[in-house]
Amino acid sequence: LYVPDHLPKPGDPGHAGHVARLVVEAVELLGGRTLVLTTTLNAMRAIGEYLQTRLDPAANVEVLVQGQSPKRRLMERFREGAGDGRAGCVLVASASFWEGFDVPGDALQLVVIDKLPFPPPGDPLFEARSQRVTREGRSAFAYHALPEAAVALKQGAGRLIRSETDRGVLVVCDTRL
């Protein structure tokens, strides 16, 4: 687990750009084998665009971004990884890749999570549950938001280790951790 302490706060407008720069260095060293999980579509697009324009062509890494191809195709291509003349891959994705996406083996060595996955403000279901917890005299943050974020973080981190022999690095780009 690595939590960079030099990044701006997650709410800072430049946060996604800083995450993208951190990812470029790692992806070039690993030859891809990286999954970037974002908590918003805006961050996903910003990081994906940055990687597509800034990765060194000599690194031989294909940038896959959720929404630019069908999900099944992105998953298949990422699992193929490098080899037999294929480039390595970095996949930048949001919500639907946080769970149920398994990549056992060497095709995945690094998972980067842009920030703690708290439920989005204004979500009616989240708001209703938070109000219920508050009416019960408990803290909505401690008893609802934080546990939901912890479960989502565990799901995202779980993309990295799928078998006893898997290993890799989890980077959470949120100084609040």
Regions found by a protein language model. Give the residues of each.
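ASCE RecA-like P-loop NTPase motor cores
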Residues: 1-177
